Amino acid sequence: MSLCGQYRLTRLFVYLGLLIMGGMSAPAAAQDRYVLAFGDSLTAGYGLRSGEGFAPQLEDTLRRNGIRAHVINAGVSGNTAGQGRTRLKWTLDGLKVKPDLAIVALGANDMLRGLPPSRTREDLDAIMAEFKRRDIPVVLAGMFAPPNLGLRYMTEFNSIFPDLARKYGAPLYPFFLAGVVGDPKLNLPDRVHPNFQGVKKMVSGIAPTIIRALQD
């Protein structure tokens, strides 16, 4: 092949290479996703060491599933739904970023104190409405009242969560303590709050619902 022919061939390969490179885009960088865990002691990590609570364990699980998540712990031990309602607006106003998703996990203390289910419903409804007003999707974590509170109380309380999930089109995780409540191996000595292993089970239960919500 002549030098002229080699030159033309080289130019052709360079041109084709530039076309190929120009048509290829770099993979999109993983997007940071912010999840607000808004609840009570079950969210706050009562009685646990740093890194053992719900928020850090959920964040770790989401990251292991390819989601560059930042889970914001907005749990306050002892909070009822009413107390959560009171602090919701200033909690959201104080955040540096708007959450991509919120987990609402309140109502356990209402039930333990025997507060009227109608009051709990009203407070949770207001919380869900505020998130909707701010265009923040919610996963609602439900709670079940035990039979010793009576059939009427149990029926009224347990219906709150599926009713509100339907009203606001929110994914419902039916029972936040599924597989944990009543198991001494998964709870602190008070038999109320989950230990590290208990929280791990809670996270493994709710994580698929969170992942689906973040992917929608």
Across the structure, where does each feature detected by a protein language model lie?
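N-terminal secretory signal peptides that target proteins for export/translocation
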Residues: 1-9
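Position-driven detector of the extreme protein N-terminus
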Residues: 2, 22-25
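Bacterial N-terminal signal peptides
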Residues: 13-23
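Serine-esterase "nucleophile elbow" of acetyl-processing enzymes
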Residues: 29-79, 87-98
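Alpha-helical cap/lid subdomain in secreted, periplasmic
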Residues: 57-60, 67, 85-216
